Design a protein with these regions (language model features):
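Extended, charged/polar low-complexity intrinsically disordered regions
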Residues: 1-389
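Residue-level preference for the first positions of well-ordered beta-strands
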Residues: 2, 394-398, 458
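AAA+/P-loop NTPase substrate/partner-engagement loops
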Residues: 70-73, 83-85, 400-405, 416-453
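Conserved alpha-helical scaffold flanking the Walker A/P-loop in AAA+ ATPase domains
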Residues: 99-111, 130-135, 436-460
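Hydrophobic positions in the central parallel beta-sheet of the AAA+
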Residues: 117, 426-428, 458-460
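Short helix/loop segment immediately N-terminal to the Walker
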Residues: 382-395, 454-456
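Walker A/P-loop nucleotide-binding motif
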Residues: 390-410
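Mobile, glycine-rich extracellular loop/lid and propeptide segments
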Residues: 413
Length: 460
C-alpha cells in the first residue's frame, strides 16, 4: 500500500449549457446556463489516480468536497469548453482561500507502514504543518516521492527531508518552476541546449545546491524530462516534439497533468521498474491526460490515461561537461552519426528506425541541432509577435543565401507552422519593381491583409 498526502484543493469546474430550444415555463431556462462540479484536487487527485494501480492510504475530507470551506482547503476554479466528446479547460479563473494565514486542512490520515510515501507539496501550507505529516517520515525509512511546486526548496518539510531522508528521496519538479527560481534554462530551442543549460545551472547556480546530492526528476513540459541522480544525468525526450508543442496543439488546457505524471511514475516504481521506465510512463500519462481532456461527465478520464509507456520516448545520457557541440545523434552506442545521416538522406525520417530529435516546420524537416535551434529561435520570435494583437511595428527578419537556397520556402513554412489559419503569404520580387509605386502597392497589399485579420509574411 502506498501512502499519499500533502496539500489538498477542491477544484471547481464549470461549463455552459444551452437554453431549451422550446420556450420553457421558466424564463431562466430559455437562456445560456452553467453547471458546476467540485472535484478532489492536489494530493487527493494524485491518490485517486494511483488507485488505478494499487491500494492507497490517503487523507479523507468527506464525500462532498464542495461542502468544505475555503478557510479549510484552497478552492480553485476553471471554466471548461466542449472539445470532441469531452471537455478541456478554457480558462483558469483563480483561487479562493482563507482571508489570512494558511488553510487549516482538517483532514485525517490513517497510520500505515508504507514502502512508498508520496507527498504533493504545492506550496500551500502543508510543508509547515508538521502535525499533518505521516509519522513514517519522522521515524521510519520509506522511499519518499516529493512532488514539489513553487516556491521551491523552502519550508520545514524540505529541511526535514534533506536532513533525514536524502538517500531515499526522489524529487519531482518542473523546468518552469526552476526558471522561476532563477535557473536560466532556455525554452524550446533544442533538447541538447536544454540539457546543457540544466547541467550548467546545477554546477554553478548556488540556489540549486540542495539538489546536487539528490535524485531529481525535472519535467520539461509534457514532452520530456531530465533525471539528475547525484551527478549522473539522463535526458528523456520525444523525438518529434519540443517543450510546449503538445500544449500549443491541444484544443484547450488541462489540469492534473502533474498528478498524472507522479501517479504513473510512482506506480511503476512500486512495481520495481527501472527509473527510465518510470519516467517514460509519467511522461506518457501526463501527455495523454492533456490530449484526452475531461470526459463527458465531466471527470478525469483515468481509465484512458494510464497505459503502457510511449515507446517513441528516447533516453540518452548527458555528458558531464557538454560545451555546445554535443548532439544526441553523436551519443554512442545509441547512434552512429554517419549511418544515421545516410539513412535519413536515402530513406527519409522514420520514427521507429531513427529516434533522433527532428523539428517539423510545415513541410520543412531538419535533424541538425544547429538548424533546429536557429529555426526555433525565429519561430519563437514569430510566436511572441503574433500574441500581440496590435503591434506597432512589423517583425523584420533578414534571410541570406544564394538563389535557390530555399530562403522563401523556409520563411513561409516557419510562419505557417505558427498559426496556419491566420497566415496569408505575400511574395514580392523586388528585382521586378519598376518604380516606387510598385513598393507602395506591395505595402498596400500587406495593409489590406492585416485589416482582414490575417498575418501576412511579406517576403521581399
Amino acid at each position: 500500500m502506498i501512502t499519499v498526502t500533502g496539500d489538498i484543493t477542491v477544484d471547481w469546474i464549470q461549463w455552459s449549457v444551452k437554453g431549451d430550444s422550446d420556450v420553457s415555463e421558466f424564463n431562466w431556462k430559455n437562456h445560456l446556463g452553467f453547471k458546476r462540479k467540485a472535484l478532489e484536487g492536489g494530493a487527493l487527485l494524485t491518490a485517486r489516480m494511483l488507485k488505478n494501480f494499487t491500494e492507497v492510504n490517503h487523507p479523507s475530507i468527506g464525500d462532498e468536497p464542495g461542502n468544505t470551506d475555503p478557510s479549510e482547503f484552497i478552492h480553485s476554479f476553471a471554466e471548461l469548453k466542449a472539445t470532441g466528446d469531452g471537455y478541456h479547460v478554457k480558462k483558469f479563473m483563480g483561487y479562493t482561500g482563507p482571508d489570512s494565514g494558511l488553510p487549516s486542512m482538517p483532514f485525517s490520515l490513517k497510520e500505515h507502514e508504507s514502502p512508498i510515501i508520496v507527498i504533493d507539496d504545492a506550496g500551500n501550507g502543508f510543508r509547515e504543518m508538521e502535525e499533518r505529516w505521516p509519522s513514517q517520515i519522522m521515524g521510519g525509512d520509506p522511499l519518499i516521492v516529493l512532488k514539489m511546486s513553487s516556491p521551491l526548496f523552502r519550508g520545514s518539510l524540505w529541511e526535514h527531508l534533506l536532513e533525514e531522508h536524502p538517500e531515499k528521496l526522489i524529487v519531482i519538479i518542473t523546468a518552469d518552476d526552476l526558471r522561476e527560481h532563477g535557473a536560466n534554462i532556455t525554452r524550446r530551442l533544442s533538447w541538447e541546449r536544454t540539457a546543457e543549460d540544466f547541467i550548467w545551472q546545477m554546477e554553478n547556480n548556488r540556489s540549486l545546491e540542495d539538489l546536487r546530492d539528490l535524485n531529481v526528476v525535472v519535467r520539461i513540459g509534457l514532452e520530456g524530462a531530465i533525471n539528475y541522480n547525484r551527478g549522473d544525468v539522463r535526458l528523456f525526450y520525444h523525438p518529434q516534439l519540443f517543450e510546449g508543442d503538445l500544449t500549443e496543439r491541444a484544443p484547450g488546457k488541462m489540469q492534473g497533468c502533474g498528478s498524472a505524471f507522479t501517479a504513473a511514475f510512482t506506480a511503476a516504481l512500486s512495481e520495481g521498474r527501472e527509473m527510465d521506465e518510470c519516467i517514460r510512463r509519467g511522461i506518457t500519462a501526463a501527455a495523454r491526460l492533456l490530449e484526452r481532456g475531461f470526459s463527458s461527465e465531466p471527470d478525469y478520464p483515468i481509465s484512458d490515461v494510464f497505459m503502457s509507456a510511449d515507446d517513441e520516448i528516447g533516453a540518452v545520457e548527458i555528458p558531464q561537461h557538454p560545451r555546445g557541440l554535443w548532439t544526441i545523434a553523436s551519443s554512442p552506442p545509441l547512434f552512429d552519426i554517419e549511418s544515421v545521416s545516410r539513412y535519413i538522406v536515402i530513406n527519409g525520417y522514420s520514427r521507429k528506425k531513427c529516434p533522433l530529435p527532428v523539428a517539423h516546420f510545415g513541410k520543412l524537416i531538419t535533424a541538425d541541432r544547429r538548424e533546429i535551434e536557429g529555426y526555433q529561435s525565429i519561430r519563437n520570435l514569430m510566436v511572441e509577435y503574433m500574441k500581440n494583437d496590435n503591434p506597432e511595428r512589423p517583425l523584420c527578419i533578414g534571410v541570406f543565401g544564394p538563389p535557390g537556397a530555399g530562403k522563401s520556402f523556409a520563411v513561409s513554412q516557419l510562419a505557417a507552422s505558427v498559426d496556419p489559419e491566420r497566415i496569408k503569404h505575400l511574395n514580392f520580387n523586388i528585382s521586378q519593381f519598376r518604380c516606387e509605386d510598385d513598393l507602395i502597392d506591395a505595402f498596400h497589399q500587406i495593409r489590406d491583409a492585416v485589416l482582414e485579420g490575417m498575418v501576412p509574411p511579406g517576403i521581399l
